[in-house]
């Protein structure tokens, strides 16, 4: 049900967000203000990716365990390279790109809670897997937004984690006994039919911080919920990164690894990026036609999320038809959610009959 609400995000949502932060950086034309959606006629009339993509049109993801400084490094890299920074997608990412941008209630956001997961990861109400499933969908939506921005403007993007690294949490949850094998199977099936449509990042930056140091940082941060995270869970996340994620990504893209101390020097990291040749991975095989189809996909948020809902009964993520109908109608009664943006009088939209 929650995914149905997520799909209600208008196709232009990401474009509106991107446009709000668009700017000219180092000669990159980053305006995405457009009246019509991209389609076949615009492609035939010459609107092709090769005209705007340059050597600085890159997708970079910054990965690492919890509290490793990913956000700080990602933001600094983006500023120094003139890229757009996408903060890590959380539970409320769909809210941030639709409506008034304010977080909505849990009923409209996967009916899950990160705080509850930290407090009771073995909760028998299915919160743990609902959380992981919802976060994957949020990251999928954000990755499509990042690619849409790249293909529309030519400006590079920097993300904190992505759909390609999301599984490290699933592995840790399963190894710790937080979720059932059926949940893992469901996740892998959803992932297999969604991630295949997307190109991996050009570069993955991994910040390697030992688990004891991660725990020290969590304690210093002082979040009462995060402080309950066990060292075993953190170690499983690290193992998934080092044993599975990094070896797999090293075959698809460039990979840079830094210690906690090295990651603090963003200037040195940017210098390392400048020296990379970017001479491997599927991006090298793309042409105007393949990028045209990719752009059509990522601008259509309904299609992006379509296969995250598969017809499999799993108690953790399944609710009844009556509850679905009730929540959907409640969602439609929220200010600005009944009609497309610009057509809701209750939030001040005017001259609707002229649009």
Swiss-Prot record:
Phosphorylation at Ser-250 by PINK1 is required for the binding and/or reduction of the complex I substrate ubiquinone. The keyword Disulfide bond does not apply. Belongs to the complex I NDUFA10 subunit family. The modification N6-succinyllysine is found at residue 285. Signal peptide: none annotated. GO terms for cellular component: mitochondrial matrix; respiratory chain complex I. Residues 1-35 form a transit peptide. It comes from Pongo abelii (Sumatran orangutan). CDD domains: NDUO42 (cd02030). The keyword Cell inner membrane does not apply. It holds the Pfam family dNK. Gene3D superfamilies: P-loop containing nucleotide triphosphate hydrolases. The modification Phosphoserine is found at residue 250. Its cofactor is FAD. Accessory subunit of the mitochondrial membrane respiratory chain NADH dehydrogenase (Complex I), that is believed not to be involved in catalysis. Complex I functions in the transfer of electrons from NADH to the respiratory chain. The immediate electron acceptor for the enzyme is believed to be ubiquinone. Binds 1 FAD per subunit. Complex I is composed of 45 different subunits. This a component of the hydrophobic protein fraction. It is found in: Mitochondrion matrix. Keywords: Electron transport, FAD, Flavoprotein, Mitochondrion, Phosphoprotein, Respiratory chain, Transit peptide, Transport. This is NADH dehydrogenase [ubiquinone] 1 alpha subcomplex subunit 10, mitochondrial.
């Amino acid at each position: 049900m929650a995914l149905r609400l997520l799909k209600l995000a208008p196709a232009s949502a990401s474009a509106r967000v991107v446009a709000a932060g668009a700017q000219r950086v180092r000669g990159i034309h980053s305006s995405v203000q457009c009246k019509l959606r991209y389609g076949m006629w615009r492609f035939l009339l010459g609107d092709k990716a090769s005209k705007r993509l340059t050597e600085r049109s890159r997708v970079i993801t910054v990965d690492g365990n919890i509290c490793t400084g990913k956000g700080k490094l990602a933001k600094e890299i983006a500023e120094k390279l003139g890229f757009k920074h996408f903060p890590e997608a959380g539970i409320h990412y769909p809210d941030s790109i639709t409506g008034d941008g304010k977080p909505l209630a849990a009923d409209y956001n996967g009916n899950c809670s990160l705080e509850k997961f930290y407090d009771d990861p073995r909760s028998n109400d299915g919160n743990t897997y609902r959380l992981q499933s919802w976060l994957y969908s949020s990251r999928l939506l954000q990755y499509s937004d990042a690619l849409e921005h790249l293909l529309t403007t030519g400006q590079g993007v920097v993300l904190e984690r992505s759909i390609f690294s999301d599984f490290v949490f699933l592995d840790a949850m399963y190894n710790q006994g937080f979720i059932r094998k059926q949940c893992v199977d469901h996740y892998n099936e959803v992932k297999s039919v969604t991630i295949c449509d997307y190109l991996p990042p050009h570069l993955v930056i991994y910040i390697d911080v030992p688990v004891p140091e991660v725990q020290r940082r969590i304690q210093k941060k002082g979040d009462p919920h995060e402080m309950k995270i066990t060292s075993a869970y953190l170690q499983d996340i690290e193992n998934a990164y080092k044993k599975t994620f990094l070896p797999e990504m090293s075959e698809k893209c460039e990979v840079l690894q830094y210690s906690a101390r090295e990651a603090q020097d963003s200037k040195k990291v940017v210098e390392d990026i400048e020296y990379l040749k970017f001479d491997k991975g599927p991006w090298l095989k793309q042409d105007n036609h393949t990028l045209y189809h990719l752009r059509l996909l990522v601008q259509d948020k309904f299609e992006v999320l379509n296969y995250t809902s598969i017809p499999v009964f799993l108690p953790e993520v399944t609710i009844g038809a009556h509850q679905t109908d009730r929540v959907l109608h409640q969602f439609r009664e929220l200010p600005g959610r009944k009609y497309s943006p610009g057509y809701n009088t209750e939030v001040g939209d005017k001259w609707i009959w002229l649009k």
